[in-house]
């Protein structure tokens, strides 16, 4: 009898372990916008976008983050996709994009569980985007937040909009972050936050 119970327990453990191994997830990584406090303006760097700037990317696999970045002259409006790149980068690259030490950054990580078909679709999208970016990087167009939203919408995590509507609604990372934090609370997703250096004024979520 004890042996049967032991075998049953072992079988259940193997099932749970196998199920957990087959349950992929992504981490949406946010760097908050900020600007130097007045007394540190000579030592702290100014960032593109300032308090409403920052950056966001999707960590799909361990030690690899998908990041939509400018790689040429900035455009005011969209056009040919000749000034940007969709990259699969290391965490070191991602967290250094603002030319500020990682431990000085204010950040939030939102862990989103995926189904296996969603993970396959993400892999397909990112492979295609790395080979050929489907849009340019523009001030009034697609940037990191709108691009990340568009991919999450393709996965069925957020509502899909037209590209124009996406750029208007998700103009900078905070707008995407607020939507995902709402979904995180609703769906019990894991959220990890880190405070930034007190030498800068940081964007808030409320």
Task: Describe the function of each predicted region.
Residues 94-116, 120-129:
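Structured domain cores in non-transmembrane regions
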Residues 53-54, 108, 172-176:
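Residues that flank catalytic or metal-binding motifs in active/ligand-binding sites
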Residues 23, 36-39, 124-206:
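Activation targets extended, charge/polar-rich intrinsically disordered C-terminal tails
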Residues 22-106:
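Glycine-rich catalytic cores of cysteine/serine-nucleophile enzymes that process amide/ester linkages
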Residues 50-53, 112-115, 119-122, 137-145:
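Solvent-exposed, acidic/flexible segments
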Residues 1-22:
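Bacterial Sec-dependent N-terminal signal peptides
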Residues 10-12, 86, 142:
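Secreted/extracellular small peptides and ectodomain modules produced from precursors
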């Amino acid at each position: 009898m004890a042996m049967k119970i032991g075998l049953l327990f072992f079988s259940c453990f193997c099932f749970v372990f196998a199920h957990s191994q087959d349950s992929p997830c992504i981490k949406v990584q946010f760097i908050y916008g900020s600007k130097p406090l007045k007394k540190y303006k000579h030592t702290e760097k100014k960032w593109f976008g300032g308090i409403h700037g920052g950056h966001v990317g999707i960590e799909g696999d361990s030690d690899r983050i998908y990041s939509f970045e400018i790689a040429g002259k900035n455009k005011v409006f969209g056009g040919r996709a000749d000034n940007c790149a969709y990259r699969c980068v290391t965490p070191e690259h991602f967290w250094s994009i603002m030319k500020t030490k990682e431990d000085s950054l204010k950040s939030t990580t939102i862990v989103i569980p995926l189904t296996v078909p969603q993970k396959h679709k993400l892999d397909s999208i990112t492979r295609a985007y790395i080979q050929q970016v489907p849009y340019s990087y523009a001030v009034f167009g697609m940037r990191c937040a709108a691009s990340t939203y568009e991919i999450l919408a393709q996965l069925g995590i957020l509502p899909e909009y037209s590209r124009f509507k996406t750029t208007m609604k998700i103009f900078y990372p905070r707008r995407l972050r607020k939507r995902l934090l709402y979904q995180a609370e609703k769906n019990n997703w894991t959220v990890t936050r880190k405070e930034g250096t007190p030498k800068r004024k940081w964007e808030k979520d409320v």
